[in-house]
C-alpha cells in the first residue's frame, strides 16, 4: 500500500491499549494448528462430507479451512509484521475477531456433522479437533489484540491498474466460489460452505475491505459492471453440463428480473404491491397462448420477438388498469387492493376454460407442451458444444435471460438517475411535499406500475418456454411475497441488493430441500431479523442507510463523501 495517497490530516494515531505479549504468537500458533489439522483426516468414512478421510490430501471443506487460516495469517501480519502499512488502513483486529468466530463455528459444525453422520464423536478423527483448537486459539488471540485508530479508507488510492486488478480478482473469486458451492450435493457440505463464505464476507466487512472495494467500484463503475457480466457469462462453462444447476440459475434470473421490476414500484416509488406475480403470469400466459403448443387457444403464432412485445404490453396494460383506480389510495389500503388483484388474476386463469368463460387458458389444466424457443434457426432445446464443453437447453435459456437481465438493469439504472426517478423518490419520502413542489404524483405512480409490469411481462414470456407449461397454481400469493422479500432482503432501491436477495431466496430452497417443511418459518424469521438489525437490506445504498439511521453522524459524513467520489468519477 506504499502507493496509497492520503492527506496529512488522515495520518493514523498511535495504538492506545498495549498488546498482550502472548496474543500475536498465539494467533500464529492457531493458524499453524488449523492448517496442520486440515492435512490430517477428519473422518474414517469417505462418504461423509465429500470424503475428508485421507491424510495429507485435503478435501474441499479442509481446503476452505486452510484458506480461512491463511486470511487470518494475513491479518496477523497486518497487525505486526511486513504488512503493518496495510494495517494502518484496515481494521485487522475486528476482521480477525470475525474470522476467528466464524472459523470456530465452522469447525464445530464439522465435528457435529461428522458425529451425526457416523453415529458418534468417537468417529471424528483427531485432525478435526486439531483444527478446531487452532480456530479457537485464533479467536482468543483476536480478543487480546487492541483496536487501533485508522486512516480514512475513502481517501485510499491505488494506481488505476491495481484497482482494476482488484475488481478482477474479486469477480474471479465470486465465479469459482459459486461454481464450487453449486457443485456440492451433500446438504451438510453446502451449509458449511455457506458458513465459510459468510465468515469471509463478514471479516472483509469488519476490516473495511468491502468499504474500500465499494469506493473502487464507484471510481470504476463501468469496469465493475463489465466484470460482473463476464463472470455471469462464463458461469455455465464451470458447471460441466449440469442441467440441475443451470435450471436453478435460470430460475434465479427470471426471479431477479421480475424482482427488479418490483423494485421500481416498491424501492423507488414506495408503493407496496402484494400481487406483482400476476404481471409475470400475464406475460407467461400470452406466450403460451401464442405458442405452437397443441393446447394453445389462439391460432396465431407470431415470431418470438413479437410475442415478447405483446406479452410485455399486456402486462403493462394490466398495470395501468390496476394502477389507475387504486393509486388514489396508499399504504395498507393499496397493499390490500394489489393483493386482491393478484388473486383475481389467478382465479380468472382458472375460469377462462371455455365453460365458465371464454376458452383462453384451459382453466386449472393450464397450457402444457409449450415448444422450445426458436429464434433465427437457433433452437434453445438443442445441446451445443463450445470449447469441448456441453451446454444444454438450460444454458441456452440462461444466456437469453442474461440479455434480459442486462436490459432490465439498464432500464432501472437510467430511470433511477433520471428526473422520473427523482420524482419517484420524492413521492416515496413525502408524497404531500412532492405534490406541493409540482410533482405529478398520480402520473408517476401509474408510470411506476406500468414500467414494473412491463419488465415482469418480458420475463414471463421467456419463463413460459423455459418451463414448457403454465398453470394458475404457479402464480399464487406466496410467489408475490417472495418477490417482495427479495427486494426487502437485498435492499430496496438497489440493483446488486435485489440480485443478491433473489439469489438467496431461489437458491437456498433448491439446495436445502430437507428444510422444505420449515421454509416459510425460516424465511419469516430471516425477515424479522432483517427488520430488527438491518432494515435497509443486505446491500443498501448509503443514502438508504441514512434514512434508517438518521442519528448516525459518521454515516452522514460517509454519504457526503460517497457523493463527492461519484462526482469525481464522472
How would you label these PLM feature ranges?
Residues 275-281, 328-353, 361-362, 474-488, ...:
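Pore- or pathway-lining transmembrane helices of multi-pass membrane proteins that form conduits
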Residues 1-25, 75, 79-102, 124-232, ...:
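Cytosolic-side transmembrane-helix boundaries in multi-pass membrane proteins
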Amino acid at each position: 500500500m506504499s502507493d496509497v495517497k492520503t492527506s496529512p490530516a488522515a495520518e493514523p494515531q498511535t495504538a492506545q491499549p498495549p498488546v498482550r505479549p502472548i496474543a500475536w504468537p498465539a494467533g500464529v500458533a492457531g493458524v499453524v494448528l488449523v492448517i496442520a489439522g486440515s492435512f490430517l483426516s477428519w473422518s474414517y468414512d469417505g462418504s461423509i462430507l465429500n470424503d475428508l478421510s485421507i491424510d495429507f490430501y485435503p478435501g474441499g471443506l479442509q481446503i476452505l479451512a486452510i484458506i480461512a487460516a491463511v486470511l487470518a495469517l494475513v491479518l496477523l501480519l497486518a497487525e505486526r509484521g511486513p504488512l503493518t502499512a496495510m494495517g494502518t488502513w484496515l481494521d485487522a483486529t475486528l476482521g480477525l475477531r470475525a474470522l476467528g468466530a466464524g472459523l470456530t463455528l465452522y469447525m464445530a459444525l464439522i465435528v457435529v456433522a461428522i458425529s451425526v453422520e457416523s453415529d458418534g464423536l468417537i468417529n471424528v478423527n483427531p485432525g478435526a479437533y486439531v483444527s478446531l483448537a487452532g480456530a479457537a486459539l485464533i479467536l482468543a488471540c483476536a480478543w487480546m489484540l487492541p483496536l487501533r485508530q485508522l486512516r480514512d479508507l475513502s481517501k485510499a488510492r491505488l494506481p488505476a491498474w491495481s484497482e482494476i486488478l482488484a475488481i478482477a480478482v474479486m469477480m474471479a473469486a465470486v465465479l469459482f466460489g459459486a461454481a464450487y458451492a453449486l457443485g456440492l450435493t451433500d446438504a451438510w457440505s453446502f451449509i458449511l460452505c455457506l458458513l465459510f463464505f459468510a465468515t469471509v464476507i463478514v471479516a472483509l466487512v469488519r476490516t473495511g475491505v468491502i468499504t474500500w472495494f465499494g469506493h473502487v467500484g464507484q471510481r470504476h463503475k463501468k469496469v465493475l459492471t463489465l466484470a460482473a457480466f463476464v463472470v455471469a457469462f462464463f458461469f455455465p462453462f464451470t458447471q460441466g453440463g449440469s442441467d440441475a444447476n443451470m435450471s436453478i440459475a435460470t430460475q434465479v434470473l427470471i426471479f431477479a428480473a421480475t424482482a427488479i421490476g418490483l423494485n421500481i414500484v416498491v424501492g423507488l416509488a414506495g408503493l407496496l404491491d402484494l400481487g406483482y406475480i400476476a404481471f409475470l403470469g400475464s406475460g407467461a400466459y400470452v406466450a403460451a397462448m401464442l405458442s405452437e403448443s397443441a393446447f394453445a387457444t389462439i391460432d396465431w403464432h407470431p415470431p418470438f420477438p413479437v410475442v415478447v412485445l405483446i406479452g410485455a404490453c399486456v402486462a403493462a396494460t394490466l398495470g395501468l388498469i390496476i394502477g389507475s383506480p387504486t393509486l388514489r389510495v396508499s399504504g395498507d389500503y393499496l397493499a390490500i387492493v394489489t393483493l386482491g388483484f393478484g388473486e383475481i388474476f389467478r382465479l380468472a386463469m382458472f375460469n377462462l376454460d371455455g365453460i365458465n368463460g371464454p376458452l383462453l387458458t384451459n382453466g386449472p389444466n393450464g397450457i402444457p407442451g409449450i415448444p422450445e424457443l426458436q429464434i433465427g434457426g437457433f433452437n434453445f432445446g438443442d445441446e451445443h458444444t463450445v470449447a469441448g464443453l456441453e451446454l444444454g437447453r438450460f444454458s441456452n435459456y440462461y444466456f437469453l435471460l442474461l440479455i434480459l437481465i442486462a436490459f432490465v438493469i439498464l432500464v432501472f439504472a437510467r430511470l433511477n438517475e433520471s428526473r422520473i426517478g427523482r420524482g419517484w423518490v420524492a413521492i416515496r419520502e413525502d408524497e404531500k411535499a412532492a405534490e406541493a413542489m409540482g410533482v405529478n404524483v398520480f402520473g408517476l405512480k401509474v408510470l411506476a406500475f406500468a414500467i414494473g409490469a412491463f419488465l415482469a411481462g418480458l420475463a414471463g414470456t421467456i419463463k413460459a418456454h423455459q418451463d414448457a407449461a403454465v398453470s394458475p397454481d404457479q402464480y399464487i400469493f406466496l410467489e408475490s411475497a417472495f418477490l417482495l422479500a427479495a427486494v426487502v432482503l437485498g435492499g430496496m432501491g438497489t440493483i446488486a441488493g435485489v440480485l443478491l436477495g433473489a439469489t438467496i431466496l431461489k437458491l437456498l430452497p433448491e439446495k436445502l430441500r430437507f428444510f422444505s417443511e420449515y421454509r416459510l418459518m425460516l424465511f419469516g424469521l430471516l425477515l424479522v431479523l432483517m427488520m430488527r438489525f438491518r432494515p435497509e437490506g443486505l446491500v443498501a445504498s448509503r443514502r438508504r442507510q441514512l434514512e434508517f439511521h438518521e442519528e448516525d453522524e459518521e454515516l452522514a459524513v460517509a454519504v457526503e463523501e460517497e457523493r463527492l467520489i461519484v462526482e469525481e468519477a464522472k
